[in-house]
């Protein structure tokens, strides 16, 4: 199941239209909420994400830290989950224990930072 979280109704409607135009009619859910509320909803429903892709507007840099911290403390991430954050290449979204950045890709003015848990189940460092 792929879950899209979008606070903008127009953007959520565009996601739905794009999926429909591709012939995708199932296997997804569009959650119309801000990231914090959506994370709480998804966590309460017992979901565990394999991948989380963050792409808040570049102007909302404070949201990166809040969202990474919320994800790091949530039950949404399993031991092998990967968090990918898109951001301006000049901006460093930082880390939120136990999430550690293990890769950064830069393309033009944009960058992708990849995170995963820094410790395994027994506390060993990865």
Residue ranges and their predicted role:
Residues 1-126:
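Class I S-adenosyl-L-methionine-dependent methyltransferase catalytic core
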């Amino acid at each position: 199941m792929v879950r899209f979280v979008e606070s903008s109704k127009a953007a959520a409607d565009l996601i739905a239209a794009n999926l429909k135009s591709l012939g995708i009619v199932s296997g997804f859910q569009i959650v119309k909420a801000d990231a914090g509320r959506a994370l709480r909803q998804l966590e309460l429903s017992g979901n565990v994400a394999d991948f989380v892709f963050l792409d808040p507007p570049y102007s909302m840099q404070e949201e990166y830290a809040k969202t990474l911290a919320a994800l790091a403390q949530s039950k949404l991430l399993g031991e092998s989950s990967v968090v990918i954050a898109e951001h301006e290449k000049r901006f460093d979204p930082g880390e939120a224990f136990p999430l550690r950045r293990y890769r950064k890709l830069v393309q033009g003015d944009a960058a992708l930072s990849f995170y995963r848990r820094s410790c395994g189940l027994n506390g060993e460092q990865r």
